[in-house]
Amino acid sequence: MDIKYNLAAAYKIMAYLSLDDHTYTHLSARSKNADFYYIYPFGLRFEEVTTENLLKVSLDGKILEGEEYQYNKTGYFIHGNIYKARPDVLAIFHYHTPASTAVSALKCGLLPISQWALHFYDRISYHDYNSLVLDADKQSTKFVNDLKQNYVMLLRNHGAITCGKTIHEAMFYTYHLEQACKTQCLLNSTIQQELIIPSVEICKKTVKDLLSFEEDLGKRDWEAWLRLINM
């Protein structure tokens, strides 16, 4: 399907799942080898995003098509620099919820204590908080370096970045990361008890099984999300 159609749908799905944060987060997508990407106009709520109002932005942050409400320097730096460094990445979701932010602030990070979390066993990166990403050279380089070759990164004291080779793969990672973070927060809110954590052997086997369970990761779920929002 059309990239703009699917990206607009992703915004609506994120809003439906309450994974938006008013106007403060952003999702983007591009075609393979493209030197530009699509992203929403900073200032809209996710429910308001349509194929018609998506912006076309160069990897250097120049608006090529569309009308913006406010120049989102931080957002354009994040998306543009990841796309430059990672030709395999065709979709980037940046979001922050109470659960993802809470887990990002824990020194232990995301623990392998649920099947949701095991999707990311030894496959998640961390980026230390350094205010807004406004220094194109210094901060953006560190951002990309911290992501490494992973598709998911927790931003300490801030939230998360989820990437994908497709929009539906990025959505898949986002949903499972949020469920994993919620579960960990629930456990942290209970009386301190010793946690049952699967062995390293089981964790390694499970992440391999989970990520090879379907040929096109997230596609089945994506089609269900589209039916849910009537798109």
From Swiss-Prot:
Kindly state which keywords UniProt assigns to this record, in alphabetical order.
Metal-binding, Zinc
Please name the InterPro entries in this protein's record: Aldolase-II_Adducin_sf, Aldolase_II/adducin_N, Aldolase_II/adducin_N_sf
Binding site residues for Zn(2+): 94, 96, 158
Query: One GO CC annotation, please?
Result: cytoskeleton
Cofactor binding remark: Binds 1 zinc ion per subunit.
Give the cofactors, semicolon-separated: Zn(2+)
Keyword Zinc listed? yes
Q: Name one GO molecular function term.
A: actin filament binding
What does the sequence similarity comment in the record state about its family?
Belongs to the aldolase class II family.
Protein name stated in the entry: Putative aldolase class 2 protein RP493
Query: Which source organism does the UniProt entry give?
Result: Rickettsia prowazekii (strain Madrid E)
